[in-house]
Amino acid sequence: PDEKEKEILEEAAKRKIPVLKIYNKSDLQAGGNDGICVNSLDLSSRDRVLNELKARLLEICSDDFIKTPPILGDLVPQGGTIVMIVPIDYEAPKGRLIMPQVQSIRDALDFGQTVIVVKEDAYKAALENLKKQPDLVVCDSQVADKMAAETPIGIKCTTFSTLFARLKGDINLLAEGAGAIAALEDGDKVLIAEACTHHAVEDDIGKVKIPRWLKAKTGKDLQIDFAAGHDFPSELGRYKLVIQCGGCMFGRREILSRINKCKSAGVPVTNYGICISELKGVLERILEPFPAALEIYRGQKK
C-alpha cells in the first residue's frame, strides 16, 4: 500500500472498521499468500470469485449492518400499545410525517405492536379513551414537557430523538453530555451540528429554538456555531459542548464517528432530543426506558 492507503488502514484500525484488501495490480506488487489469486481474463471463474468475495464481505460485516437494530420494538412486549405524539408545525413536511416518525411506526408494526398516532392537543383525550394504559409513549422533543405532564407516573415515555440516540449513536455518552449544559459559562462556544442541509424555516429547531432555549436555561451569553451536512469542524477543542441532530439522514457509523471525535477531543456531546429534554427539565423521565443511560445522567448531575 502507498502512504495514503496506509493512513486509511491505520484510521480503520483506530475505528475498529474491518477491511478487505483487494489488489488489482498484482504484477506490480505481491499481495501476500493469504489471498485468492484471480485471472481477470478467465471469465469462467467470474461468478465463483464474485460469490466468494460477497461471502468474505458478509463475514467481516458487523451484525448491525446485516440486521438492523430495533428502534423501539424491543422496549414494548409483543401485542403492546404505543402512543406517538406528532406535532404538525412549520417544520413538518406537507402531506407526510418525518422520517424518524415513519421508521418508528414501521418498527413497532414489525414487532406486532399497536400504534396510535395523535397530535399534541389530542393526546390527553386519546389517553383517557384507552381501556388499558399504553406500554410506551413517544413524542417529538418539542412537546416533551407537555407529554411528561400529561402522562401518569408509571407509563414509560421518551422522544423520537432519544430513540435515535440509541439507534444511531451512544445513548449513554449522549446522556452524560447533557449534564454539561449546567456547567456552561459566559463566552463558552457551543457547536450545533445538523445532518440535513435544508433551508432554515421560521422558528427552525436547530438554528432558532435550541439556541433560544439554551440561553434561557443557562442565563449565559453563549457563542453558538452551526455545521450542516457533512461539514464538521476538525478543531473541536474550542467547544464546551457539541449538540448533534438525531441523524436520521446519516448512517450509524457516521454519527459514531462524530461522537468519537468529540470524545477524543474531550468535548461533551449530546443530541437534539436529549438536549431539549434537559432544557425543558424532563430528561430523567425521558430516559426511564433506558436505565443505564439514566444512571449515567444522574451520576453526571451530582
Model regions: which residues?
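Conserved C-terminal guanine-recognition region of P-loop GTPase G domains, centered on the G4
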Residues: P1-S44, L57, P69-D74, L97-N129, ...
